[in-house]
Amino acid sequence: MYYTRENHKRFLDKELTAISESYLKLLNTKAISLLASNDVYVTQYVKLDLKKNDIGADRNVLGSGQLMLRFKKDKGIPRKNEYFTAVILEKDMCLPKNWGDTTWGKLRSHQVEFSEVHCVWQGKTDDNGFLLCGFSGISLEMSQYLIDNRLEGCVIILGPQEPPMEYYQNLITVISNTSPDYPAKEILDFDKRNIVWNPERINSNSSQVDKIVAFLNSNNELVFQGPPGTGKTHLMAAIVARLITENKSVLVTALTNRALIELAQKDSLKEFLIQKKVKKTNVSADELISCKNICPVESKQITCMPGSVTLSTFYNASGWAKICYEEQPFDYVIMDEASQALFGMIAACKNLGKRIIWIGDQNQMQPIILLSEETLVRNDYGMLANGFQTLCDKFDFKSYILTESHRLLPNAASLTSLFYHTPIKSVADFEYQIDVNKLTFATQNGGCSLIFTEMPIGEKADRSCCSYAIDIIAEILSCHPKIYISVLSKFRTTVRMLQNCFVSRFGGLNNVLIDTVERVQGMTCDICLYYIPNTMMSMSLEKSLFNVATS
């Protein structure tokens, strides 16, 4: 075997230590200092948006069941898609004047309720000096607490998101099991060899489902590579629908809840939603409303029923994988976003079911690792960190690549093809709508444009340069006010400045997103502006990051 289990455990231990130390540093920092650095926000609870169209159309409402909070404009606001732990504190501790030298960790000991949330829209209020922001992901428990106690107007503190330490602890348990008949053993104990990656080319049409399901009737593993916009979620939903029809039990696991909900909302699964055959762990208030027929299930209890699909994140499924290996309860396990899975999680799928489909793209974002590049190289941990890449390079499983892009027009598709060993063909069913006579920087038939400007060396968040980028967005909006635009950058500090420049001019718009590249993989928009500051350019131009940003 290439890696001993002890080597694998050492990698996970080191990464868990790095995560723990980083979070411990935050816990031991004075809460008032985190407030000053915009790592903590003091907000006022306005309401829970439990009805569709409950908010004006000028605000970016990505569904309903959202938590609406009021912010002081001069204190800054979160960036869209930024994740937090929302905390309700005991009365005396809800105001910063009572915090003194209290650390964030000590302040959390005064909480009466909490939930992970993330910001999905920003907008102006009628009150001078205040802004409204909307948050998705609030737990059903915290939602019920706010409603039952009629807490409109109370203070809610937003603080650092808790890291997935239990996920790493689960994977350590998974890879430490040395039982001779252990299902994950087949993946974990691979030998040193190189396989030529040569997947069969297919499209995402539903006609492919017969061939895929027939193959899985006599084989246990299948790997899909899905370049940007090639319809992998559409195809995955069609496969799941077929398996439910055949009375199979299916688990779909992904890194994010967003990916799972996108799958559940596909047309192929609508009938099964109504029949309560689509189940999900850790359903949030907004998910329960935007996907109203989804069936919430207990996260600690493995829910496996013939003729149904269970949706669960890596975080939760890893906990199941460490205890259910003797049964392999599911008939089929489908891992979405597999390119963002550690190798231990790739292997854990074998514990969960008898037949496995891994779907990812090794040319897009890899897992986020806190260990330094030097540590990864020196200890030869790269293959353990980039699990899907290792699966494609070291295992001779049947593989497919989706080669038709529904998202990109021909020029853009041909540029994206540069990242792949096979051409990506555009089958987009829309026309190029940009007025090149008014927007001189736009290309004639789509594709990429380069816009140069003077930038100070070493500055990630230069206000004048960020304002220039927003000027470009303003020019686009003046010609095409309804077009969907993403403004992306590698660095959080850059994104914060871009958001400040945008919000001060436009407030919150439902068709403009400003975020880091890492948070938007799989998203579709009409125009993407990728801002590359004049510092650490190798990071902004890293191959997989650049592919995501420009595709």
Task: State where each predicted segment sits.
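Hydrophobic anchor at the beta1->P-loop junction of P-loop NTPases
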Residues: F224, V252
